[in-house]
Design a protein with these regions (language model features):
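Extracellularly exposed regions in secreted/surface proteins, prominently low-complexity, repeat-rich
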Residues: 149-208
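Short, non-transmembrane alpha-helical segments in secretory-pathway proteins
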Residues: 57-89, 137-166
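Serine/threonine-rich, repeat-prone extracellular segments and beta-strand-based repeat modules
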Residues: 86-104, 163-179
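C-terminal motif of bacterial Sec signal peptides marking the signal peptidase cleavage site
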Residues: 15-18
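Bacterial N-terminal signal peptides that target proteins for export
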Residues: 1-8
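Short, low-complexity, disordered segments immediately C-terminal to signal peptides
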Residues: 9-10, 20-41
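N-terminal presequence-like segments and adjacent domain-start helices
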Residues: 39-73, 130-131
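A short, surface-exposed interaction/processing loop segment used at functional sites
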Residues: 125-141, 202-208
Length: 208
């Protein structure tokens, strides 16, 4: 006697597949963004605009003299570092007329003071000088614009670029990292957080 064989036709196979149903253990990747690290304020895309420069010196000597040149460029140096406009002025405990001069100067950025140690060498028409500051200006407007630009370049989700609410509108800090952070949410839903740092050449964002 030949063995009895049963052939499962296509319709029966389809029915069995339908009865098995979907795999309930599989889960789709979540598109929900991660929660921000803390309450913050949305940053603005508005450029703080860089000031053309300090007001023309009135009590720094004749224009083009070494003293007037240094006075003006000290202010411009602080404006460039801050990345934001302000009313500036500068005072020094010595005048830069001739010879080797070491002076202590203070640049006022609105109501903020940026002290500097200035060294100059002046001979005839030749002038070399340098200025060293230990603090820099943090401007919330500039920080916000820079962070928004980074978020846009990194394809962050719209409306997620934020910085600490406690960050002041303007303040001076020693060069290096500050207590403040900024963050945004990536297209994949993860949060990128960086620490705000004040540098001699401007604001940077460091790994938190």
């Amino acid at each position: 006697m030949r063995p009895f064989r049963v052939s499962l036709g296509p319709l029966l196979l389809l029915a069995l597949a339908a009865c098995s149903g979907p795999d309930t253990t599989a889960t789709a990747p979540s598109s929900s963004p991660a929660a921000p690290p803390r309450p913050g304020l949305l940053v603005s895309s508005a450029h703080p605009y860089t000031a053309d420069g300090p007001a023309a010196p009135t009590d720094y000597g004749a224009p083009g003299t070494p003293h007037a040149k240094i006075m003006r460029e000290l202010q411009q140096q602080v404006l460039n570092q801050a990345g934001a406009p302000a009313h500036t002025s500068v005072t020094c405990d010595k005048k830069f007329i001739t010879g080797n001069v070491k002076a202590k100067c203070t640049v006022k950025f609105d109501d903020l003071a940026v002290p500097m140690d200035v060294t100059a060498s002046i001979a005839d028409r030749y002038l070399t000088w340098s200025a060293i500051a230990s603090v820099g200006v943090l401007s919330r407007t500039n920080v916000g614009w820079l962070w928004n630009s980074k978020a846009v370049n990194d394809n962050a989700r719209l409306g997620t670029a934020m910085c600490d609410a406690a960050m002041p509108d303007q303040a001076v800090f020693p060069f290096g990292t500050t207590p403040f952070f900024c963050w945004y949410t990536t297209a994949e839903g993860s949060v990128v957080e960086k620490q705000v740092s004040v540098g001699r050449r401007g604001i940077t964002f460091e790994k938190a």
